[in-house]
Amino acid sequence: MKEIKDLKKNLKYVFVSYHDPDYYFGLNVIHKAFPEAKIISTAQTAYLIEASKDMKLDVWKKQLGTDAPDTLIVPEVVDTLPAIEGNALEIKYDKNDSAHPFVWIPSLKAIVGGGSVTEGVHIWMADTQGDNDIAKWQQVISTMKQLEPATVVPAHFVSSDYTPKVLDFVEKYLADYRQAAAKSNNADELTAAMEKAWPQLPGKDNL
């Protein structure tokens, strides 16, 4: 927010790309700083936030303490995004998985990956419960790669150079996780298998 204000940019929209709490718990702070900015998302993202926000706050409130949001904002639903400084922005998602949208900027050949793209750290898989859900995620990554992007912005990363190689990382990680899940009898076995497959990767608490 400080950078936006320092640049004297007129923030008009905040696009919420995913329904996990880390994507919307801070919206009240952004709204207070930029009250004129519209907070928007796809219909599916707004629906999933509305359906789970109170339960998610109950889960996280104790851990967050005074940092817990005092207001939970559900985004306004949109089908399209406005252009920014002449650059068109397109909401993309696989037809079988509307819960994982991402933003494609054709003029820059850039993807803002949303919740589907993580780099250099164990991927949070707790909300991806079944093999079918992993397969849908893999298809989203395939859809991204078919666009042949020059730049990919991950949602979660330790460090990133914003290159398309992040999609290779997610693709390989999901394949390893899917294989390990099929062979594991419980969560401990699955965690051990992923730690063995990716011994140098930080973020083991995500498993």
Task: Set out the residue ranges of the language-model regions.
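Metallo-beta-lactamase
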Residues: 47-99, 106-107, 148
